[in-house]
Regions:
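N-terminal secretory/targeting leader peptides
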Residues: 1-36, 48-246
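Core domains of carbohydrate- and sulfate-ester-processing enzymes
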Residues: 41-45
């Protein structure tokens, strides 16, 4: 709708414009800060692809941090066989690659599905968590994977029509938000620390994979997601992988 002019500006996660651009998931897979992506050409590459679709990328204005698997039952290794999980497209391939069965469901249904054991877990970012879920969630699996990024975007024609001084104001505010929302930054780390402390008080424990199991978990997440990107975009995918990963 943004690309067709129904809206002038939109703020949303990249998961919402994957239907417009199959390469969109690379944003959640970035292993560089956004300042680094702006320097190495990664941001410009994606901005050009979005521009072709009629959308101007302004900035990444917020980040809810890494996604996690949240569970009602304990697991002792990175093997999800025997678990039925609520999923979104973001991490469906990853969870299925480790043996889970999956189903989609609207956000308001997650509590009930966990409560009645229809599902034993779900994926969700580190921040932006729904407090009542603590009653039906027992564990957060570490490490997290991907990042939950939100972007400010404009209809390309509308953006082109704006006076330069207006563009400058928008860009200045957007870039300040982009820097502030960096997961490696102090403000995000402080928010995450506060969130983890609250979860601990609610009785939500941590399952942390270490050593080879940690490496396997992280690699499985990366391989599953990039596998989808490369399959959907054989031309741009390999180039973007070089720009977005270390």
């Amino acid at each position: 709708k943004l690309s067709k002019g129904a809206f002038d500006f939109v703020g949303c996660t990249e998961a919402y414009f994957g239907n417009l651009l199959p390469e969109a998931p690379v944003f959640r897979l970035a292993e560089y800060t956004y300042a680094e992506l702006r320097k190495n050409g990664g941001w410009d590459y994606m901005a050009n692809l979005m521009g072709i679709k009629g959308v101007h990328m302004v900035a990444r204005h917020h980040d809810f941090g890494p996604f996690h698997l949240w569970l009602s039952k304990k697991i002792d290794k990175p093997n999800l066989k025997g678990l039925h999980l609520r999923v979104a497209p973001v991490y469906t391939a990853f969870f299925k690659s480790l043996g889970a069965t999956v189903q989609t469901a609207a956000l308001p249904q997650i509590y009930t599905l966990m409560e009645n054991n229809t599902v034993q877990g779900y994926g969700w970012p580190a921040l932006g968590w729904v407090p009542p879920w603590a009653k039906v969630t027992k564990y957060r699996v570490e490490p997290g994977f991907y990042t939950s990024t939100l972007f400010t975007m404009a209809n390309q024609k509308k953006w082109n029509s704006l006076p330069q001084d207006v563009k400058d104001v928008i860009n200045k505010a957007a870039m300040a938000s982009e820097a502030k929302g960096e997961p490696a930054g102090p403000e995000f780390k402080a928010s995450l620390k506060k969130q983890h402390a609250w979860l601990e008080k609610q009785g939500v424990g941590v399952i942390e994979f270490k050593g080879a199991e940690r490496d396997f978990w992280v690699k499985s997440a990366k391989d599953a997601a990039w596998g989808e990107v490369l399959a959907r975009s054989p031309v741009h995918g390999p180039k973007l992988m070089k720009l977005f990963t270390k």
